[in-house]
């Protein structure tokens, strides 16, 4: 299971996942989708909540996860929802770390 793995150091010379590898790992996640922004592949999910406070608390938990894994997403906090987007900045693409952290985000709300 992805949520049981730890992120590894991802240097600028790390190799980004192929499209096939991304698709295979995506099968292990629920509700996440692959997208591209400014030519950079990214992994994104929108989480829904009953109010702003719940969304804010979840955002803080994702921030704590990011610090623990030393891998940081884009987090968009809005009333009743949080959009989390993972990608590996150093390689301008997707790494297994992104899928590990996505799985750990899902674990937060279970």
Curated annotation (Swiss-Prot):
What are the protein's GO molecular function terms? 4-alpha-hydroxytetrahydrobiopterin dehydratase activity
Matching SUPFAM superfamilies, A to Z?
PCD-like
Under the heading Pfam families, the entry gives: Pterin_4a
Enzyme Commission no = 4.2.1.96
Catalytic activity from the UniProt record: (4aS,6R)-4a-hydroxy-L-erythro-5,6,7,8-tetrahydrobiopterin = (6R)-L-erythro-6,7-dihydrobiopterin + H2O
Signal peptide span per the entry? none
Descriptive protein name: Putative pterin-4-alpha-carbinolamine dehydratase
InterPro entries from the UniProt entry? PCD_sf, Pterin-4-alpha-carb_dehyd, Pterin_deHydtase
Q: Which CDD domains match?
A: PCD_DCoH_subfamily_a
The highest taxon in the source lineage is Bacteria
Q: Which family does it belong to?
A: Belongs to the pterin-4-alpha-carbinolamine dehydratase family.
**Key words of the record:** Lyase
Swiss-Prot/TrEMBL GO biological process terms: tetrahydrobiopterin biosynthetic process
